[in-house]
Amino acid sequence: MASSTDSLVDEHSLSPISHRTPLLPRHASDSDDEVYCSQTSRAHQVKSYIKQATASLRWTVQPFLPTNPPHWLQTTRPLSLPTVNHRSTSQAVFLGIWLLVNLALIRQSWSLSNISEPSHFPQPTKPEWLHCVESYWLKDDGCGLNGKDCSSYRNVTMAFRCPSHCGTSTGLLNPRVVGGEVANYQPLVVGGGGQGKRYRPDSFICQSAVHAGIVSARWGGCGVLKMLDETHGFSGSEANGIRSIGFPAPFPMSFTFLDNVHTSGCNDLWLTIILLNVACSAIFVLLLGPSPQMFFWVLSIVGYWIVPVASEPSSLPPSWSKATGNFLPFLFVCYWLWNVCWRDTLETISSLDRVWVYLGPWWFGVLMNLTAGWVPLDRLTPHDLQQRPGAFLALSILMTITAILVYHQACCLRKEKRFEKLAVPYAFLAIVLILLCFVPEHSLRIHHYLIGIFLSPLASAKTKISGVLQGFLLGMVQNGVARWSFASILEQTSEVIGDGYLSGDSMPEFDLEQSGLINGLKDLKVSWKSEGPDDRASLVGVMVNDVLRFIVPKINQSLIIHNFLNNLTSISTSPSPLQAAFNQVFFRLAFFDNKMNAEHRISEYTGPVTFFVNNQTWLGPTPVY
């Protein structure tokens, strides 16, 4: 009887006092209605207990680092100061010093460079900024017939400055023809070998300077470039981590770099600025104990500005107007991120744990061009995924990791009874993205800043993994907006491809069976088939050795180059001398129209066809896409 009573006590103690039933046995006079009420009361007790036991789960984040910091940390943290005002004052002073040191380094890095050279720049001169992929000579026929549109650069001498990271990490993103070779996903440097160290003028100047040892790939630098006249060939070589391409044929212009140059203030201080801010952010969190909200906004502001001034500037020198123009809308994005995912999670993580939970992943995201620049994914286009080595594998690995993390976060949010609120917005987002894929002549571009925004709500669970993801995704947003602005999610396909080849573009077709040496091996005949894309294609442009030399009627179906070894002329065009002897001749064709009495190219150029003079044979065309 006693054990039965104890059992009843345990069971009934789970319910409120108002619902408890008498512990003594019922009298025989009790009615059946009372029995029914007692059973109903017990059922209500069980139901109430189950409901309480299965209430919404709340994660408890256990601190990874000790709750009580070391003695030296306790004695130096302003948290131990007697008033909140003292702590706020110390934080304000530290932030002010942090800002002033950054401004001094930024000024030194961008505004104090000078260069001098005895013969051309005897007095210190401020150099001209160049991007890593700038060149004098434009792609294909960008310099016009016989290169006349670029002739003003002859004998030009220029003092220039290159930024950091102009080595193998940057280069071509679309195919570029150099003689009989098609280069892509590599630096564009033609020549530089041999005694003269001359480069073809379509070479990227800064990467050529790295190849020549004039500037540093890591720190940048200054130099003096001098344009020269025609060169009869360019030797390829490998130096300073860059492999240059050889070109065994004449070209109308070339350039070289002068020696005996004196420079000051030309090194890019990007690493010093980054290390300073990494150290200051850690000190600020460890020693000054900011509130969660202050912690978030300091990270938001510092991470945004570190990109245009140090890690990945969008213009040279940094464009303050562009950076400030994007800063205000970026702050609205940060306000949304704080309210949607950061606030609840950050408040559950201790100040010491925030260093490794947030700061490390956040810096990894802010410096994505440095930490993940080796991943072969610049544009998620079908061409890049098919042609670029390792691109498809890298995308597969990233998609797998993303899917695992999304599933984990969805499970965490489901346990917190918050996943249902996100299901409808994400379903609507998926429908919108699918519809955008079908917009004609446009491509869906999910930039990495959009990935950071889209995935942030899934990282709002109260776990340390969520904190890691929040820091990394915030860094992604900052890197994307500060470098590329708020780029559109929908872009024209031609803009995405840039100067690449459009699929389905109609190009002329060589007729090599009808081509070759004629008239006693003195003249060279180049033939093509007469088919064209439409009636507009009334002309054919002929590039010889990567220079547009002739524009002739398509109906002729051939071009005869008289005495081509000594004087490259045609009966159909004005003379265009090329006084040199060579063993290989490279040809490419494109369709032109004659609109408004001016020739306009209406197709891409074919791949190169090589004619070997020694054995009178043809090779090609080499595919370019």
Regions found by a protein language model. Give the residues of each.
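Generic detector of multi-pass transmembrane helix bundles and their immediately adjacent loops
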Residues: 342-485
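Interhelical loop segments of eukaryotic multi-pass membrane proteins
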Residues: 109-132, 296-303, 316-322, 346-354, ...
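Multi-pass membrane glycosyltransferase architecture that uses lipid-linked
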Residues: 283-284, 302-311, 466-498
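Juxtamembrane/interfacial segments around transmembrane helices
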Residues: 150, 328, 449-457, 472-485, ...
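Soluble extramembrane domains flanking the early transmembrane region of eukaryotic membrane proteins
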Residues: 2-273, 563, 569-586, 590-625
